Amino acid sequence: AGLQPMEDGTIRYYPPEGGEETLSGMSPAAIRKLGIKLSFVPEDRLGMGLVAAMGMTDNMMLRGYKKGMPFFTDRKTPKAMAEQLIKELEIVTPGVSTPVGRLSGGNVQKVLVGREISSDPRVLMVAYPVRGLDINSSYTIYHLLNEQKKQGAAVIFVGEDLDVLLELCDRILVLCGGKVSGIVDGRTATKEEIGLMMTKTGGGQYE
């Protein structure tokens, strides 16, 4: 449907072949220059999100590394952050130094989402955030995302479960064949309406 290229283009893993992405008339690069924080929770938790062989403390430090902060020098702040996440999100782990790759899928996702929202982002993109998780872990993640919405963050939820999308989203953008086939109100849209857009038999076509 074109979801992966959209994710990659938005967070700039790969440069887009055409078009542009803007928020309030500004590109992602311009937004970052203003100090507005963008966070991303990728679909591949241990491939793109976290380093499996590292503990929570070191994985917390990776976000600071992207900001140009001293790497592997200040360990107190990320360690305190890791300990706080363990307490607040009820992450089950032997300790902050235990490699995250040894944790269950639900706990790994809590670590990843917790790290990304700890920076108080203005825009938070999450891709399939509850895929493969049990029901309790899924609801924990949903709660965290809803809390971000309440705090004023723009949450971009990438997914395919229509029941979840209709429950969580204010607006739903439907992609088909790599193009936007419609944008609907999540409060009033139906699965049938969205399904037609997904198969190009309903809705318009946006470039």
Question: Can you annotate each of these PLM segments?
Answer:
Residues A1-E207:
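Glycine-rich phosphate-binding loops of nucleotide-dependent enzymes
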